[in-house]
Amino acid sequence: MSVEKMTKVEESFQKAMGLKKTVDRWRNSHTHCLWQMALGQRRNPYATLRMQDTMVQELALAKKQLLMVRQAALHQLFEKEHQQYQQELNQMGKAFYVERF
């Protein structure tokens, strides 16, 4: 074989090896991707359960907070009405009996 032919054969061999390496890398990454997807599918139910549990806890806390806010607003309303009632009685010359300590 001539030197030129040997060079061409060697170049084509190098190209073939480069292509083979590329295909091998693609296969490895594809296999890794499939493995990650399977792993994610196994982990996903647990993540969903944790997220649902967190949502339930947050909802319970939000309900409790809303209840406290509503109770405070109701207490303020009763205090305001009581003050108004006392003022009306004072204007009429009457008053509540208040025991002093």
Curated annotation (Swiss-Prot):
Species, as recorded: Homo sapiens
Q: Where in the cell is it found?
A: Cytoplasm, Cytoskeleton, Cilium axoneme; Cytoplasm, Cytoskeleton, Flagellum axoneme
> Would you kindly state one Gene Ontology biological process term found in this protein's UniProt entry?
flagellated sperm motility
The organs and tissues expressing this protein are described as: Expressed in airway epithelial cells.
Listed PANTHER family: C1ORF189, CILIA- AND FLAGELLA-ASSOCIATED PROTEIN 141
Record bears the keyword Transmembrane = no
The answer to whether UniProt assigns keyword Cytoplasm to this entry is yes
- Provide the function of this protein: Microtubule inner protein (MIP) part of the dynein-decorated doublet microtubules (DMTs) in cilia axoneme, which is required for motile cilia beating.
One GO location term (cellular component): axonemal microtubule
Paired cysteines (S-S): none
Q: Indicate where this protein is primarily found.
A: cytoplasm
Q: How does it assemble?
A: Microtubule inner protein component of sperm flagellar doublet microtubules.
Name the gene. Answer: CFAP141
From the Swiss-Prot or TrEMBL record, give the protein name. Cilia- and flagella-associated protein 141
Q: Which UniProt keywords apply?
A: Cell projection, Cilium, Cytoplasm, Cytoskeleton, Flagellum
Pfam families noted in UniProt: CFAP141 (PF15104)
